[in-house]
Design a protein with these regions (language model features):
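Hydrophobic alpha-helical transmembrane segments of multi-pass integral membrane proteins
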Residues: 1-425
Length: 425
């Protein structure tokens, strides 16, 4: 606990609003899924799905990651966060930009609001990247986790700039590559460059710490780093130049890199001293099981089997949903229970440690509700994926409804933690 809430940690007022905004956005997204299941049965380039996707990746996942990273950077790099002012400004701009961007996509309007929103997001990301880079620069701790985090932020900046370029190209076409291929480039830069590498950088530090694992082989992370980045660059260039063989080759480089990271996590799991996994770690473990699905789908889509031609559009949506709604969302919810309670606990009880009997951080939320939330999420996600793959809106609606219940329970626990009042007065 002291490792997560280190002396270098920023004010909780910087971190906690990110969790609150992110949780409410996830709840809003599940509502949109319930009332717009048809968005998942069309080609992925449709207004509703674009709006939902950007709410997911910016307002929910990236927002939570920003907040968590402000808390964790001082732990990983052993220095104070460079600027809390940058963090607050970035939060405000990202929140406003995400809402306006989602509204513009929903209206499929590429006018003034869209470009104001995109500018807000780009500036927010720019402030975040500057904060991370300046923090990293002041650190003398040169570890592979630091390299992953710094690299992921560069990819995030590339991703949002690519998104802005896409919006400009939609209104004033100047690129020969089709918008669909450019959208794939934008999406994979974000998924593999930003999310996957950030997850590797943070989890390779935190998960062994949470499981109390020692002497795990970090060379596996170095292999993962070079394989993922070489493969990603090759893949993006191939997408832009529309060289299909290059795209397939890039996947054949990236996937073994991810498996090298998963091997590191499995080794940490087998060497763990703490045998009993709590609910946060159980949901984290479930998220890694979900990864099997996008691995299977990506090669199914790349090799373009003739008998699956009619299924290509729904399988493409299923692939993205498995990564964003399945793997990353599950991981974020699981790690919320491993980070936020410690942050709030220290804020509330900092001056009383050792003086009175205090509740544990895990006492700040309801474990029964967290377990119910995990089961509902698992059932809802499976139904959602079946509904997408089979293009059956009734199953999509049912899956979305169950995900809504899961998101509601997650938010109940989230705000129970955030508004926790001190006990043993």
């Amino acid at each position: 606990m002291n490792q997560i809430a280190s002396q270098n940690a920023p004010s909780p007022k910087v971190v906690i609003p990110h969790y609150a905004f992110g949780g409410l956005t996830w709840l809003a997204v599940t509502l949109l899924i319930v009332f717009n299941p048809d968005a998942f049965t069309q080609h992925f380039f449709n207004p509703e799905l674009l709006a939902i996707t950007h709410l997911l990746v910016l307002g929910w996942i990236t927002m939570i990651i920003f907040g968590a990273l402000y808390q964790l950077l001082p732990v990983i790099m052993e220095v104070k966060l460079y600027s809390e002012s940058f963090a607050i400004a970035s939060f405000i701009l990202l929140g406003l930009g995400t809402i306006l961007l989602a509204f513009s996509f929903w209206q499929f309007s590429f006018g003034t609001i869209m470009f104001v929103a995109a500018t807000f997001v780009v500036v927010a990301v720019g402030l975040f990247v500057a904060n991370v880079l300046f923090t990293a620069h002041s650190s003398t701790k040169k570890v592979i986790e630091r390299t992953f985090i710094v690299t992921s932020t560069i990819w995030l900046l590339f991703t949002v700039l690519a998104g802005l370029t896409l919006a400009v190209n939609q209104v004033h076409p100047f690129l020969k590559t089709s918008q669909i291929e450019l959208l794939k480039l934008h999406a994979h830069a974000g998924i593999v460059g930003w999310f996957i590498q950030l997850i590797i950088g943070v989890s390779s530090k935190l998960l062994p710490m949470f499981m109390v694992s020692h002497h795990v082989n970090t060379k596996k992370l170095t292999v993962a780093y070079y394989a993922i980045n070489i493969g990603l660059i090759a893949g993006l260039v191939s997408l832009f130049l529309q060289v299909k063989f290059g795209v397939i080759l890039s996947a054949l480089i990236i996937v073994p890199g991810i498996f090298s990271y998963l091997s590191f996590i499995y080794e940490a799991y087998t060497k763990r001293v703490k045998k009993q996994l709590d609910i946060g770690m159980k949901q984290t473990a479930f998220s890694f099981l979900i990864l099997v699905i996008p691995f299977f789908l990506i090669f199914t889509l790349l090799f373009n089997f003739k008998f699956l031609n009619n299924l290509t559009p729904p399988l493409s949506v299923a692939y993205g949903s498995a990564i964003v709604i399945g793997f990353i969302t599950s991981l974020v919810m699981g790690q919320t229970y491993k980070t936020l309670p410690f942050i709030v606990w220290l804020k509330v009880y900092r001056g009383r440690i050792g003086k009175v009997v205090l509740p544990l951080p895990k006492d700040l939320y309801s474990e029964k509700i967290a377990i119910a939330q995990l089961w509902l999420f698992a059932i809802g996600f499976v139904l959602l994926l079946i509904g997408i793959s089979a293009s059956i809106t009734r199953i999509l609606f049912l899956g979305g409804t169950i995900l809504l219940l899961s998101a509601a329970l997650y938010n109940f626990n989230l705000f129970k933690i955030i508004f926790h009042k001190p006990k043993n007065k």
